[in-house]
Curated annotation (Swiss-Prot):
Keywords: Amidation, Neuropeptide, Secreted
Protein name: Cydiastatin-7
Cellular compartments per GO CC: extracellular region
Superkingdom of the source species: Eukaryota
Natural source organism: Cydia pomonella
Annotated compartments: Secreted
Keyword Transit peptide found: no
Similarity annotation: Belongs to the allatostatin family.
Annotated positions of the Leucine amide modification: 7
One biological process term in Gene Ontology: neuropeptide signaling pathway
Length: 7
């Protein structure tokens, strides 16, 4: 993914 921050 693009936004794979793990939030």
């Amino acid at each position: 993914k693009m936004y794979d921050f793990g939030l």
